Amino acid sequence: KSFFRSLVAASLVIVSYSADTTSVPFDAESRDQIFQHHARSVISGYTNTLGEKNISVPSSPPGGERVGILGAGIGGLYSALILQSLDVPFEIIEASNRVGGRLFTHKFPNGGKYDYYDVGAMRYPLPKSDDKGNYQPGVMQRVGQLFTYLGMHKQLIPYYFKSNKSPGFQYFNGVRARIGEGSSFDAPALGINSSLIDIGVTKIVNDAVGPFAQALFDDLQKHTTTGWDDMMKNDAYSTRSYFSFKYLPSPSFGLPSEHFSTRVINWLETFDKSTGWYDRGLTETVLEAIAFGEVGDGEVDWRCIDGGSHVLPDTIAAFLHKKGGNAFVMNASVTAIGLENPNKEDSPMVVVAGGQKRKYSHVISTLPLPVLRTVDLKNSKLDIVQSNALRKLQYGPSIKIGILFKEPWWTTGQDKNGEKFDLVGGQSYTDLPIRTVVYPSYGVNTNAPSNTLIASYCWTNDAERMGSLIGTGKKTYEEQLEHLVLSNLAAVHNTDYQYLKDRLVDVHSWDWNHNPLTMGAFAFFGPGDFQDLYTSLNRPAANGKLHFAGEALSVRHAWVVGALDSAWRAVYNYLYVTDPAKLPKFFELWGKNAEWFEQPGDGKEPNSDNSLLEKFVRRTHGTVSV
């Protein structure tokens, strides 16, 4: 998966167990509309429970006072871009010595131009665009528009989700095959009957999640909520429990009409996702299936950034510096956020960072939620539901191990049988500890091909186990990790361990779960989280002056676009209660997120008459004179 699933990472991992890959067959715009419908229904259902009574908003401090932005990741930087365009003063507080957060590229010292790997976000499944960077509607449209706004669309290069030459490998149960060759991988030894093997993992999984996706799409066409209602009836299920207690195979498969055994579910999970994925929410799996469909379907333009994903936050930071001077406070960890006087409704906000108190009119926090929970919030007046959400909302672990070799052996080398690897981009998959191998897409067709390989990309339980060997500071464990990874690579590629060892130059490994500034890789919702936790943290705290943002607070979480969407919503909340006269320019420059408007129907554009966001703010935050 891409990190943040572009970020922000689990990304879309499509493993073809049988000869054909599957997808939920919607075009890019329809997929985006389904996400909008899902988010709109969650928020609308919650908002409607609040009743019509509005509460007056405390008067805000006089205009001109700074907004504090916590975190210089992509969500914080995007918030700053929006505020700057509206002439709203701001200051960004960042705990580290760099911007970008989980957009992080490691460049190997003394390596060549393309000897780097993206530790965080690494790939961007954008909608189609013209030569000027005008993007068609789609799930990632806002990301594409950001590249264009910054003049970066020419820096995007093809990302090969599938190898540009020969297919990658699958190596499961000690059996190796090129992707698409269609091996059973000795599944009968696991007690998997031949009928299931013949049908294939992808068809079975689509049979389970596809009807939910289709029903959500039908809602859009018929202006109903039937599909949504059915999805919510099953929202309390994990993917595993749904297969165990609810799902029955379609009659067309010719299988017994019975729920799946644990053995079969484990088999599905192994080839479909990562270890433990099916313990997370069913809704999460459905949205994953909808997100981008089949790779290569023509609707998605997979891209990466020439030079690495860090180029994006670095470009934003330079843009902000050029337009408004130095608004960054670096190397300052936030330890407290709250009202200066919790008993006064017009009290300003105070943030303690780097041991110093800093005063703001409002605060937008883009800190990862596990990190935010370690901050002193006693004067922020979070309600019980919000406090529980910070404790409960799940983040998924993720690790990456990048290796610099002397040469790109995965392209130029050959295996023990003399078969050339011939891999350019794409991925290989295995049940060995390294799980996913990602071959570089940058440096292709240049005189400086990348010698760097993402030798292991893991998430969920697989990442937790590999992460135990990362960052220990002990040479013994570093050597153990190196030996494990090289041994796994040799098995997957049918080559000798020593062949790889002789070509190794350097190793860099990263564990997001044990990083004190993230405490996890990306939001990964469990059963029921959408209905409860998601709604509570889209509300502000501290008398409406503490706004939460970040990829976790979007239905598109774990992708860069989720961080952008939530930042857009947080800035809207701030403007609505402080300077609503700026909202027309806000919409003109930064567009609208359709999920925050009632489904207009009849081709009408979202407007103030159908603004779900305004309704949400009024009922959770109060009213102002507009």
Swiss-Prot record:
pH-activity dependence text: Optimum pH is 6.0 to 8.0.
EC number: 1.4.3.-, 1.4.3.11, 1.4.3.14, 1.4.3.2
Biotechnology: Ammonia is critical for agricultural and chemical industries. The extracellular production of ammonia by yeast (Saccharomyces cerevisiae) expressing LAAO4 can be efficient approach because yeast can avoid growth deficiencies caused by knockout of genes for ammonia assimilation. Moreover, LAAO4 is able to produce ammonia from food processing waste, soybean residues (okara) derived from tofu production, demonstrating that ammonia production by LAAO4 is a promising strategy to utilize food processing wastes.
Signal sequence coordinates: 1-18
GO CC annotations on file: extracellular region
Subcellular location(s) of the protein: Secreted
Family per similarity comment: Belongs to the flavin monoamine oxidase family. FIG1 subfamily.
Subunit comment: Homodimer.
Protein name: L-amino-acid oxidase 4
